[in-house]
Amino acid sequence: MNYSVIMAHLNECGYKVSAIPSTTAEVGFLTVELEINGMPVTLWHIAVTELSKMPSFLLAEPSTLPRLAHTAFYPGSKFASICVNVPDAVSVNFECPELAFEESLKRHVSLLSQALTDSEWNTKELLREFEAGWLNIVEPDIPPFLCLTESETPEELCVLKPSKGSVGLGKYHLGYAEEAVPDNIFSPINQLLKNRQAAKGNGFVIPLSVLKPAPWKKDELTDWYLDLLSELPTNVQTKLTQKFAQKRSYEFWLIFNAQTPSGITWFGIHFSQKNAGKGRKTLPLKHSHLAEWVLEPFIVLTFNKERIMPWSGAEQSLTSKKLCLLDVVP
């Protein structure tokens, strides 16, 4: 692909584009220097031999900018990928690839401009993609936590260990409220509880009225958790400090749920003592107490209508609708 023509075209369109050679090609990368809302922004494109899709660009040095929605930053990397939605089909003329680059750049710049100039929109979009952001700080070898309650009030959970040698749901920690377990011994829930041992810890469901975007990096989790506690409603704060925080244990599982623009999201933080030999301790609620604990984010899976119904093709918004059946006789 002739990148000289592409560079010339983009420069004519007003972009400041430069080429960087690689070890194998004269043009290994393109860089595009921008200024958005007074902030310098640099985009990188990795050169390809031919176009099979819309050209993509990476955001360089994302840590120098505010946290931006629709970007994925990976610890240790100097770049973030940019998720540019393509609502309209684009016809790519392979004889004129420079037009595809122009269209792609327009979309990248438009997205970044909105994120950097409209903080309210950016925050809303970060909350919409909260689960993706949370997953970004969860270690790959940390299994999900299976929560069998969908309580909208603070609730204590019984936590069970994974079943030895199990696969699938059996290898997850499981939390349930005692009154939420059906008496029917043939129920799927009872089958999940069967032959499991209790964990040496306590679990609590904490509903949130205010949620902030997920931490960008795992080492931000401690401060993010304390900020989360400071925004709790009074009734939740009272139950947390006067009841839950009186429990002593070697480990805790906090299960949070909150409303986001994309629906109710569930996520969790596991607390384990750095030195279990010092005996059981209460749930850490202050920065000074957290020095003795290891915090590990994890994914929460729930058995509720919001998660299960779409798998079968059901639409939850129809639950409050009335259905009229008509029998047409020829």
Predicted regions and their residues:
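Short N-terminal secondary-structure initiator segments
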Residues: 12-40, 297-323
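Amphipathic alpha-helical segments
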Residues: 1-14
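Defense-system signaling and execution modules centered on TIR/cGAS-STING-like, death/scaffold domains
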Residues: 25-26, 114, 129-134
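Rossmann-like NAD(P)H-binding beta-loop-alpha module
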Residues: 329-330
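Glycine-centered motif in EGF-like
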Residues: 64-126
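Long, charged, helix-prone linker segments
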Residues: 126-150
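Compact alpha/beta protein-protein interaction domains typified by the UBC
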Residues: 16-87, 99
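Glycine/serine-rich phosphate-binding loop and adjoining beta1-alpha1 elements at the start
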Residues: 143-326
